[in-house]
């Protein structure tokens, strides 16, 4: 099983458990998760996100067989070109996570498109978390809303050569991303961390709308517990073959991992 939506490090507004490399691997073992894509939780609120990437690179060094590092960078922070090259060439990071609401830009900003195209040229995947934490849990100093899904769709259209993961989102089936159309390329996949199975069965809808090959397993740990994501797979009315694709096979292909992982 491969989790495409996990984190390491501290977060400015709440304590996170199991947030070290060793601690997260032990936590993954409890739930039968073999590998996880991780990025810096601290970099979400750092003025210079590269400091968080350096911390993650150090944490995953002893766990590269289990943890797949992604960078957190801001397209509007000076010097991102150098930081992106370091993350790719020196840290071996497979992708980048973008947090426009936290880093004060929009996905439609031309600088964001330039960043995405540069990362795509390096073969890196672009992950866009729609939410970091429930707004009801946010501290009194901040008010960060969920990312607008139509804004994500506009970036997907503008960068057809990039590979995207839309993470920790809900309502996707009813958005432009779910409805699709001739003008939206099939260059994005969706993780299951916040989509429903029982109420409205958004997961089933997404399988029908996007296809079973574009649904990925994700938990959001340690911001969220892994249990609900596992329960969704158990409850999903789909064949064992489809569930196995969601558990790991789709992530292997989407992330460009060796076929035996």
What are these regions (language model features)?
Residues 1-8, 17-35, 85, 209-216, ...:
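Mid-to-C-terminal alpha-helical segments outside catalytic/metal-binding sites
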Residues 1-4, 37-40, 70-72, 97, ...:
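Active-site neighborhood of phospho(di)ester-bond hydrolases with catalytic His/Asp-centered motifs
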Residues 5, 28, 56, 60, ...:
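Conserved, mostly hydrophobic/aromatic
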Residues 5-11, 129, 168:
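Histidine-centered divalent metal-coordination motifs
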Residues 12-19, 43-50, 74-80, 103-110, ...:
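Acidic-and-aromatic substrate-binding clefts and catalytic sites of carbohydrate-active enzymes
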Residues 19-26, 51-58, 80-83, 149-152, ...:
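Alpha-helical scaffolding within the catalytic cores
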Residues 34-35, 47-135, 261:
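Active-site gating/metal-coordination segments in enzymes
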Residues 91-95, 108-216:
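Catalytic pocket-lining loop regions of alpha/beta-barrel enzymes
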């Amino acid at each position: 099983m491969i989790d495409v939506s996990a984190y390491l490090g501290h977060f400015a507004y709440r304590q996170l458990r199991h947030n070290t490399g060793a601690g997260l691997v032990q936590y993954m073992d409890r739930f039968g998760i073999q590998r996880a894509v991780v990025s810096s939780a601290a970099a979400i609120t750092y003025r210079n996100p590269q400091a968080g990437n350096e911390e993650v690179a150090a944490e995953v060094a002893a766990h590269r067989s289990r943890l797949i590092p992604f960078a957190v960078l801001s397209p509007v922070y000076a010097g991102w070109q150098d930081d992106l090259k370091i993350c790719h060439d020196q840290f071996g990071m497979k992708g980048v996570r973008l947090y426009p609401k936290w880093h004060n830009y929009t996905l439609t900003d031309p600088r964001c498109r330039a960043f995405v195209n540069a990362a795509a040229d390096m073969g890196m995947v672009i992950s866009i978390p729609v939410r970091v934490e429930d707004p009801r849990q946010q501290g009194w100093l901040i008010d960060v809303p969920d990312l607008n899904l139509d804004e994500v769709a506009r970036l997907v259209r503008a960068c057809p050569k990039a590979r995207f993961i839309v993470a920790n989102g809900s309502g996707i089936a009813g958005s432009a991303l779910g409805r699709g159309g001739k003008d939206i390329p099939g260059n994005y996949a969706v993780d299951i961390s916040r989509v429903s199975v029982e109420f409205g069965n958004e997961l089933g809808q997404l399988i029908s709308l996007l296809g079973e090959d574009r649904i990925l397993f994700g938990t959001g740990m340690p911001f969220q517990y892994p249990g609900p994501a596992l329960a969704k797979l158990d409850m999903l009315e789909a064949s064992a073959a489809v569930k196995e694709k969601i558990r790991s096979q789709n992530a292997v292909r989407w992330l460009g991992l060796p076929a035996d992982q």
